[in-house]
Amino acid sequence: MTKRPEDTRVVVGMSGGVDSSVAALMLKEQGYDVIGIFMKNWDDTDENGVCTATEDYEDVIRVCNQIGIPYYAVNFEKQYWDKVFQYFLDEYKAGRTPNPDVMCNKEIKFKAFLEHALSLGADYLATGHYARVDRTGDEVKMLRGLDANKDQTYFLNQLTQEQLDKVMFPIGDLEKKRVRELAKEAELATATKKDSTGICFIGERNFKTFLSQYLPAQPGVMQTMDGEVKGEHDGLMYYTIGQRQGLGIGGSGDPWFVVGKDLEQNILFVEQGFHNPLLYSESISAVNISWTRPHIVGENGELTCTAKFRYRQEDHHVKVKMTGEQEAMVIFDEPVRAVTPGQAVVFYDGDECLGGGTIDDVFKDGQKLSYV
């Protein structure tokens, strides 16, 4: 950075949570010209009739007043509906398990919101994500957050070089425990507020109830691969590969898991055993691949690296073979359990997040598995 902090304007995306509150506090203490902005992306009254966005914005106002920075709210409900929620519904309709947080970061936080921040004369957009940006070389690199348990690069895999150039992650070098301590030391209003979970901006509501408002559920047969009927499912969209909870199959022996779906016949396939061979695959096809910087893949279109197929999963050694501009086959060194179409595959080289894509089809012994 060539500008001095006091001449550098940073817009902080504030959610009303402790992470973004501490991000804003740190930047203010470092001397930056900081503006706090709250994004309203969803008309969200929860099951109890409480509008959580109103509560969150009130917390943003309290924190901004405490640390002495201006604050605003912006509304991206239409963009969120068009770019994220519609995709989310379409994927569920297709029997897949989407990751709306990845799409939200790609289309809203680091696209629509970043553009808005730059239009306000901001030099950077900062968020409370657990990730790091390395600007020491010619290209900007995105690194995992220092707190391995909280690292969020999995959800940020679609960020491009142009976006990373304009982004700051102030808490990426901290452990969650330290973030809480800093908030308490500064007596921030959000210091003891619990972390939000649930879908990006939709929050912690009953998922089945929520989804059924938009997609009519179609109950059907739940059976083994040999055709033995085990009960009825509530609708294929409510189940994901490797799922154990909510199947309602009694009896003795090993627990039951979802091992496949037949969308045309509306059948949910289940089998017993956590390590059931049907849950393991050897390769995937991936689409919508994006790299965090150019020239990551060799001229032969291949790359050897590690990958995650779901959040907080250990890294798996893989070989990536590009089959198109944004498509690839990803071959695993060892079989991996419960790799699920619609989820993100994210590539790493040590601490660096190289990029990622969406899992399309899943293969074993050269055969496509009946995952949708």
UniProtKB/Swiss-Prot annotation:
| A molecular function (GO) term | tRNA binding
Q: Which residues bind ATP?
A: G13, M14, S15, G16, G17, V18, D19, S20, M39, G128
The EC number(s) this enzyme carries? 2.8.1.13
Where does the record place the catalytic residues? C104 (nucleophile), C200 (cysteine persulfide intermediate)
Q: Which GO terms describe its cellular component?
A: cytoplasm
Catalysis performed (reactions)? S-sulfanyl-L-cysteinyl-[protein] + uridine(34) in tRNA + AH2 + ATP = 2-thiouridine(34) in tRNA + L-cysteinyl-[protein] + A + AMP + diphosphate + H(+)
EC main group: transferase
A biological process (GO) of this protein is: tRNA wobble position uridine thiolation
Site annotation (Interaction with tRNA) points to H129, Q343
Name the UniProt key words of this record, in alphabetical order: ATP-binding, Cytoplasm, Disulfide bond, Nucleotide-binding, RNA-binding, Transferase, tRNA processing, tRNA-binding
- Disulfide pairs here are C104-C200
Subcellular location(s) of the protein? Cytoplasm
Q: Which domain of life is it from?
A: Bacteria
Similarity remark: Belongs to the MnmA/TRMU family.
What's the stated role of this polypeptide? Catalyzes the 2-thiolation of uridine at the wobble position (U34) of tRNA, leading to the formation of s(2)U34.
Instruction: Report the protein name in the record.
Output: tRNA-specific 2-thiouridylase MnmA
Q: Which organism is it from?
A: Bacillus pumilus (strain SAFR-032)
